[in-house]
């Protein structure tokens, strides 16, 4: 996670801003075996998702799941992928646009970003963009 202490981007007296981070669970970058492997490894390594003890789960994940599931998952993702990319990311960007439009009618100095728990853009990248 990024550190925001001593942030050189902050300028004293520049006025207050409010940041809004729109988050979601996440999506792979593309519907390919390699992208799904990266995404599934991140997602399925989270102890809040898989509560099996790490000593038991790690060999299953790395020995079986990540060698079989990405190709199957890529096929499923390809069936829902659009020209705009991931449906989840596309709809999240659309929601952000509508939220931004609504809020900017009433308030100023609001900055917006998207962050995903798994995949890109990550929550820490979203926070950095604020």
Where are these regions (language model features)?
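Active-site-proximal alpha-helix that buttresses catalytic centers in soluble enzyme cores
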Residues: 2-130
């Amino acid at each position: 996670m990024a550190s925001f202490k001593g942030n050189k981007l902050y300028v004293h007296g520049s006025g207050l801003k409010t940041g809004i981070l729109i988050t979601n669970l996440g999506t792979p970058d593309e519907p390919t075996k390699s992208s799904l492997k990266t995404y599934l490894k991140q997602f399925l390594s989270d102890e809040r998702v898989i509560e099996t003890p790490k000593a038991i789960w790690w060999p299953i994940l790395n020995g079986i799941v990540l060698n079989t599931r990405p190709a199957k998952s890529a096929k499923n993702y390809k069936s829902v992928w659009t020209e705009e990319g991931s449906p989840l990311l596309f709809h999240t960007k659309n929601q952000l646009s509508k939220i931004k439009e609504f809020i900017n009618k009433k308030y100023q100095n609001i900055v917006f970003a998207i962050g995903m728990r798994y995949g890109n853009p990550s929550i820490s990248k979203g926070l950095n963009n604020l």
